[in-house]
Amino acid sequence: MSLPGKFITLEGVDGAGKSTHVGFVAEWLRGQGREVIVTREPGGTALGETLRELLLHREMAADTELLLMFAARQQHLAELILPALARGAWVVSDRFTDASYAYQCGGRRIAAERIAALEDWVQRGFAPDLTLLFDVPPAVAEERRSSVRAADRFEQEAGSFFARVRDAYLVRARAEPHRIHVLDARQTIDAVQAEIARLLQDLT
């Protein structure tokens, strides 16, 4: 699927610090004269934000969680992402489908084949142009999580859950090195953002 705009996603375990860099990516691109839409998953649309509240704060079966994630993603694509890209805007999303492989496959241990089937149905070959994966060891991420706001349903998971999530992310990165770039998020913010700027320059 060829569209005039570009789609950039930011990924990482809770506590990796990716949300810190969403604004930097958007402002850097705006500085290049791009129209930029910043969004997130789950969420990004009115329906998606309603589903986000359910996903973050209500107990549910793992398969239910996965299906709701992709329901929100379908609406996100149809209502926001694809129309924006079609008019030439650049879309920057805090999480996308790699998070489903990390959290629902790695963390929840749902078979990757189930996620791939949903991905194929919902996305029909569509994928980000660039994914920035912010990586930190589980202990560092846990320390960062404990120092912020009240934890949501995912953030309350055990360290072993996040270790599986991280491993699943790194498996994805090794499988798609042309798209997914792993950033050592233990570095200073300035060092990480210098690396981000280099990757954005290559894309533009």
UniProtKB/Swiss-Prot annotation:
Family annotation (Gene3D superfamilies): P-loop containing nucleotide triphosphate hydrolases
EC number: 2.7.4.9
Domain of life: Bacteria
Gene assigned in the entry: tmk
Matches recorded under PANTHER family: THYMIDYLATE KINASE (PTHR10344), UMP-CMP KINASE 2, MITOCHONDRIAL (PTHR10344:SF4)
Catalyzed chemical reaction(s): dTMP + ATP = dTDP + ADP
Pfam families: Thymidylate_kin
Keyword Kinase (UniProt): yes
NCBIfam families: DTMP_kinase
Cellular compartments per GO CC: cytosol
SUPFAM superfamilies membership: P-loop containing nucleoside triphosphate hydrolases
Enzyme category, top tier: transferase
Keyword Nucleotide-binding included in the entry's annotation: yes
GO biological process: dTDP biosynthetic process; dTTP biosynthetic process; dUDP biosynthetic process
Binding site residues for ATP: G12, V13, D14, G15, A16, G17, K18, S19
Function summary: Phosphorylation of dTMP to form dTDP in both de novo and salvage pathways of dTTP synthesis.
UniProt keyword terms in alphabetical order: ATP-binding, Kinase, Nucleotide biosynthesis, Nucleotide-binding, Transferase
Family of this protein: Belongs to the thymidylate kinase family.
GO terms assigned for molecular function: ATP binding; dTMP kinase activity
Identification of the protein by name: Thymidylate kinase
